[in-house]
């Protein structure tokens, strides 16, 4: 690279994001449990909408996403004027950093938090501030202690990825109330639908002017391949984000498929119930063979091994058995493997394989 042609400060500090592995060399039809995907896929109604959309591929999509915003608002009891849609919730995170962070500002997140928080902060030249967790769970006091007059954004995934842990409404409220006046709390609810009765921060958004929530269609809705997310917040903040959002950032196919998906809450309920059943089963099965995990509220568990060597060896053994899980050394958890909750057959298969691995140790 020429010394005269340089990227903005911070960009060269970004490590390339590595997604969950999809294939194992030499093994056909490996079972992928590495990306927290819904094993049942999208709603049949969403699939029908996807197929119908091919008839209008020559037309530009809506610029205001009115149909999808209205559907989201009706399902969740929101004001559609305060909903913004993006290419996954990642794009909403990027918008927030572009609009409210920059050089000489701080963006806070927890030590085992989603890697895109750091990446998005560095991309705008902001200072990423990582705060410690307490036994792989968000520590509100640590976040508040890290705040300074330079703090602009605080990102919190609840439930968190890759730990699966979460904090309650009282702690969320205490965090929002304790932030400095110039800071925005961003509640990332990518896995919120897996938690019965959890509003993902909606009550806080409605009561306060410094809280934004984000959601995704990639997890329980089974639309990871289409990349659709949304955010909800104070009107003033959403107005700012829409000013930097590309007018055609979502295709007609994305919009119509997501609208059908969010309206089919029966499918969501079935997926949530099945996930809860087999998440408990898998966690208990692994605990019985000496592989503990924290109580997860998402669609995965974080299996803990004695050390990084055992975790790596188990991962390699699982791959040899046609099972793909996720190493999380990049999240500072080298002794752990994150395992997506699949259907019954998948859960039984991975539990059996890990038991075999432990017997060979």
Curated annotation (Swiss-Prot):
Task: Provide the E.C. number(s) assigned to this enzyme.
Answer: 2.6.1.9
According to its UniProt record, which cofactors does this protein need? pyridoxal 5'-phosphate
Cite the annotated pathway: Amino-acid biosynthesis; L-histidine biosynthesis; L-histidine from 5-phospho-alpha-D-ribose 1-diphosphate: step 7/9
User: Which reaction is the catalytic activity of this chain?
Assistant: L-histidinol phosphate + 2-oxoglutarate = 3-(imidazol-4-yl)-2-oxopropyl phosphate + L-glutamate
Task: Give the disulfide map.
Answer: none
Name of the top EC class for this enzyme: transferase
Alphabetized GO MF terms: histidinol-phosphate transaminase activity; pyridoxal phosphate binding
Q: Which Pfam families match?
A: Aminotran_1_2
The Gene Ontology biological process annotation of the record reads:
L-histidine biosynthetic process
Top-rank lineage group of the source organism: Bacteria
The protein's UniProt keywords, in alphabetical order, are:
Amino-acid biosynthesis, Aminotransferase, Histidine biosynthesis, Pyridoxal phosphate, Transferase
Q: Report the InterPro entries cross-referenced here.
A: Aminotransferase_I/II_large (IPR004839), HisP_aminotrans (IPR005861), HistidinolP_aminotransfase (IPR050106), PyrdxlP-dep_Trfase (IPR015424), PyrdxlP-dep_Trfase_major (IPR015421), PyrdxlP-dep_Trfase_small (IPR015422)
List every position bearing N6-(pyridoxal phosphate)lysine: 219
Q: Which family does it belong to?
A: Belongs to the class-II pyridoxal-phosphate-dependent aminotransferase family. Histidinol-phosphate aminotransferase subfamily.
Q: What does the subunit section of this Swiss-Prot or TrEMBL entry state?
A: Homodimer.
Q: What is this protein called?
A: Histidinol-phosphate aminotransferase
Source organism: Cereibacter sphaeroides (strain ATCC 17025 / ATH 2.4.3) (Rhodobacter sphaeroides)
Lineage of source species: Bacteria, Pseudomonadati, Pseudomonadota, Alphaproteobacteria, Rhodobacterales
């Amino acid at each position: 690279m020429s010394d005269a042609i340089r990227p903005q400060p911070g960009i060269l500090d970004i490590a390339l994001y590595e997604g969950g592995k999809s294939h194992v060399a030499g093994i056909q039809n490996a079972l992928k449990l590495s990306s927290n995907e819904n094993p049942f896929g999208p709603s049949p109604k969403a699939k029908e909408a996807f197929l119908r959309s091919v008839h209008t591929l020559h037309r530009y999509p809506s610029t205001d996403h009115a149909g999808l915003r209205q559907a989201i608002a009706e399902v969740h009891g929101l004001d559609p004027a305060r909903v913004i849609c993006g290419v996954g919730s990642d794009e909403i995170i990027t918008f927030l950093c572009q609009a409210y962070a920059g050089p000489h500002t701080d963006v806070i997140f927890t030590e085992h938090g989603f890697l895109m928080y750091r990446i998005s902060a560095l991309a705008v030249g902001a200072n990423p501030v990582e705060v410690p967790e307490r036994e792989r769970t968000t520590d509100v006091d640590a976040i508040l202690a890290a705040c300074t007059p330079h703090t602009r954004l605080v990102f919190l995934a609840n439930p968190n990825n890759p730990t699966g842990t979460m904090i309650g409404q009282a702690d969320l409220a205490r965090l929002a109330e304790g932030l400095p006046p110039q800071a925005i709390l961003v509640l990332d609810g990518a896995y919120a639908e897996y938690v019965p009765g959890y509003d993902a921060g909606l009550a806080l958004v409605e009561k306060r002017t410094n809280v934004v929530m984000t959601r995704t269609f990639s997890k329980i809705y089974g639309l990871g391949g289409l990349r659709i997310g949304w955010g909800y917040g104070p009107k003033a903040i959403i107005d700012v984000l829409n000013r930097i959002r590309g007018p055609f950032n979502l295709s007609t196919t994305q919009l119509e498929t997501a609208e059908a998906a969010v309206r089919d809450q029966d499918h969501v309920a079935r997926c949530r119930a099945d996930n809860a059943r087999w998440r408990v089963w898998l966690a208990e099965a692994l605990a019985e063979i000496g592989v503990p995990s924290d109580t997860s509220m998402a669609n995965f568990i974080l299996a803990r091994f004695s050390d990084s060597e055992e975790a790596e060896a188990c991962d390699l053994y699982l791959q040899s058995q046609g099972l793909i899980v996720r190493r999380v050394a990049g999240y500072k958890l080298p002794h752990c493997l994150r395992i997506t909750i699949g259907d019954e057959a998948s859960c039984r298969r991975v539990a059996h394989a890990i038991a075999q691995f432990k017997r060979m140790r």
